């Protein structure tokens, strides 16, 4: 990897493919294209690889550094492409701790300890939750995760919010909150009245079913020893100096303007407003950073859609892309890391798994580390310190960031203590992942459409724009919003470019 210093001029590079973004999607696109015999340059704005996966450290009151995963971390059994890549890279994994009883806090603030997956709610609420989940899965079965906009009722399903639909289906607020948590705060990290039923069904379909999202032992199954960013670090190590860090792409020149669109009388230059050949064919691409000028025949835009506008496209994107990108936005979530002398909850026979629909902290899990990591963990050994990870989502995250630091910490730990008791209030280390403040992320976990946006504009998200191909978890079918989706999309982009090259050359891909 190369970290470029600031220079007065630009260094020129020439590659078959320029990849913008060195997260899992971009690195997989580059790795795939290179394996097919193409030359690549990966330009990354940050001074690290990994995108929304990020291994980090937090200093504790004991003066020691403790390992945390600032970004995405879990692997579920259906994420087969990520699983195979992790195995190929030789990265060990371990299962999330889940032995013991779980904790549920109901809308009245009463704490319940329970076994299994079903919340300890009133029988009526339990039946209502089962009925709603069955109804969602019935609709999910009709959805093609690769093209939800093709459903015969896509526009209808896309104009009603997930919350409104739940309230039409049920008059049980607790059931509604508990079902909503798995899509709203748990995945899209937006209030359930701000995204559509169709968007919720896409989330379900991408995981195989809504019941898979409900099953925390499925969706949050395993972790990578040393952190999920290790996947990107390993791929970047393979690519070597083809990866250049600290180089945000300022301008992407990608097409010749259509002279017929110029309007000299009104001072409008020629552009490509009416579209280009959306076939992903080679073109003349120039990516400009502060220090580099990369000439290529293809570009892979491997950043989340909310960051597309950070690049000045010359000429500007066609009108339909420009409009579509304005209907996609990031969610907002705070990932809470609290490190303790020991995993004290285990002493009390608790798993560390906690839920409370509609509460400040709606989910907590035992996130105790294992294996080698930045803090000096031993191979295959569990950290003696216990770590809890909790999540503060959407409007609650907004409220927390508005507070002074100590008030925010006290409020969050107080909310966690509702589940696990007063010892929760005394971590030796405390850290909040703030992806919304990251210039090259601007939110978490991923982007989703506003009401009506998916059915109108979703068909554009994976379609190449001239020589520009797209790759990120935000536009995935399988693995939507997950690292697995990023890997799949990166691989698909790399293969699509290689296949196009082979077709144009009259040769098979290998």
Task: List the predicted regions and their residue ranges.
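FAD-dinucleotide binding site
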Residues: 1-510
